[in-house]
From Swiss-Prot:
It catalyses: 3-phosphoshikimate + phosphoenolpyruvate = 5-O-(1-carboxyvinyl)-3-phosphoshikimate + phosphate. It comes from the Bacteria. Catalyzes the transfer of the enolpyruvyl moiety of phosphoenolpyruvate (PEP) to the 5-hydroxyl of shikimate-3-phosphate (S3P) to produce enolpyruvyl shikimate-3-phosphate and inorganic phosphate. Coiled coil: none annotated. This is 3-phosphoshikimate 1-carboxyvinyltransferase. The active site is at residue 306. Pathway: Metabolic intermediate biosynthesis; chorismate biosynthesis; chorismate from D-erythrose 4-phosphate and phosphoenolpyruvate: step 6/7. Its EC number is 2.5.1.19. InterPro entries: Enolpyruvate_Tfrase_dom, Enolpyruvate_Tfrase_sf, EPSP_synthase, EPSP_synthase_CS, RNA3'P_cycl/enolpyr_Trfase_a/b. GO terms for biological process: amino acid biosynthetic process; aromatic amino acid family biosynthetic process; chorismate biosynthetic process. HAMAP family: EPSP_synth. It is found in: Cytoplasm. PROSITE patterns: EPSP_SYNTHASE_2.
Length: 424
């Protein structure tokens, strides 16, 4: 569909939160690196997850789909040295996780992608390639990366203010190399929550890594992943949309969430509570955010960049000023998210000023409505849908199908909660 036209209304009801995309990526990778059969259940087949599945299959994993389950056997992973082709689509996780994994043994691999993926930085890996004499060539505009060689253990110095996906990619890979390795983080580490997810998943599959206060990671070589069965928990980055709607006056019960989760995006609860909303735990794995007298705050984007667009919606409708800080990495996501959410919410009647690494948001009582553009970014599209619940007039969102990247059932769930929309 080319656009959705939403008539403003409050959302009410219960919604099963989709499985965590971040955890599904990690479980699929660890299972594919295990010698034996694993069953990964509660999978949502978004475009990003399909990209990782197909990528691991290209590297030799046997993956079968049974409804919402994956049966994965990694007995033949990287057993041959044939030329390998991996289509990452628009998934930065697939690309940055699988690049080092593909080099566990001597290989020739071609990675391609679409959309903004070619513009997302890979300099961290290029520096490693050059240091280890791994051949590579790269076309930026449309991702086309060719690499040839194998990765060796040793010392890896990585900046902490880059995407945590680089560090996770190395954490998956280095335990399988012959020699011991050390990852040294040279600046303050951002997105620690995503590193915690990786370390937790790796440990579940039998691999040990010593974490020295996120300053360095000590990794013994010659380890092996052990197969296991794993159920993917609900995704806090998707729940954040409904939590935000709740903070703005909707009444939504979010099902299948684990309050003890390591997911960094769980921080959305603390941020919304700090602004004046209230968390209700009605039963086990069932959470709601209740509307309160919302006030502006300071939100540090460095540890939870994915939930910043929808938190900007909440801030736009809160009293006083909110500042988004340390958000420069949002400019190199599926789109420039700082610019996109600022531009589109201002079209709806918000008062937002864009800074180099953040936003200044002056709250308004209500938004007006109008025509906006998703920038073909799933999180921008869903954030604008939540904004519509506090608009006075219709909201028209162009290019809404981009939600398939992470949450294919979003528009159906939106309607099931009472959202009034028509497609064109």
């Amino acid at each position: 569909m080319k656009k959705v036209i939403i008539t403003p209304s409050k959302l009410r009801g219960s919604v099963k939160i989709p499985p965590s995309k971040s955890m599904a990526h990690r479980a699929i990778i660890c299972a594919s690196l295990s010698k034996g059969e694993s069953v990964i259940s509660n999978i949502d087949f978004s475009e990003d997850i399909i990209a990782t599945m197909e990528g691991m299959k290209s590297l030799g994993a046997n993956i079968k789909v049974e409804k919402d389950k994956l049966i994965i056997n990694g007995e033949n992973i990287l057993k041959d040295s044939n030329y390998k082709f991996i289509d990452c689509n628009e998934s930065g996780s697939t690309l940055r996780f699988l690049v080092p994994i593909s080099l566990i043994k001597d290989n020739r691999v071609n990675f391609i992608g679409r959309g903004n993926l070619g513009k997302r930085p890979l300099k961290t890996y290029y520096e490693i390639f050059e240091e280890q004499e791994i051949k590579y060539s790269y076309e930026e505009e449309n991702l086309d990366l060719n690499i040839e060689g194998s990765l060796k253990g040793g010392e890896f110095k990585v900046k902490g203010n880059i995407s945590s996906q680089f560090i996770s990619g190395l954490l998956f890979t280095l335990p399988l190399l012959k020699d011991d390795s050390k990852i040294i983080i040279t600046t303050e580490l951002e997105s620690k929550g995503y590193i915690d997810l990786t370390l937790d998943m790796i440990e579940k599959f039998g691999v040990t890594i010593k974490n020295n206060n996120y300053r360095e990671f000590l990794i013994k070589g010659n380890q092996s992943y052990k197969p296991m069965n794993y159920k993917v928990e609900g995704d806090y980055s998707q729940a954040a949309f409904y939590f935000s709607a709740g903070a703005l006056g909707s009444e939504i019960n979010c099902l299948d969430l684990d309050l003890s989760s390591y997911q960094g995006d769980k921080e959305c609860i603390e941020i919304l509570e700090g602004m004046g909303a209230r968390l209700i735990e009605s039963q086990e794995r069932s959470l709601s955010i209740i509307h309160g007298d919302l006030n502006g705050t300071i939100i540090d984007a460095s540890q939870c960049p994915d939930i910043i667009p929808v938190l900007t919606v909440v801030a736009a409708l809160s009293k006083g000023e909110t500042r988004i800080i340390n958000g420069e990495r949002l400019r190199i996501k599926e789109c420039d998210r700082l610019n996109a959410i600022c531009t589109e919410l201002n079209k709806l009647g918000a008062d937002i000023k864009e800074l180099k690494d953040g936003l200044i948001i002056n709250g308004v009582k209500d938004l007006i409505g109008g025509e906006v553009y998703s920038h073909k970014d799933h999180r921008i599209a869903m954030s604008l849908a939540i904004a519509s619940t506090r608009c006075k007039k219709e909201v028209i969102i162009k290019e809404p199908d981009c939600v398939k990247k992470s949450y294919p059932g979003f528009w159906e769930d939106f309607k099931s909660l009472g959202g009034i929309l028509r497609e064109e």
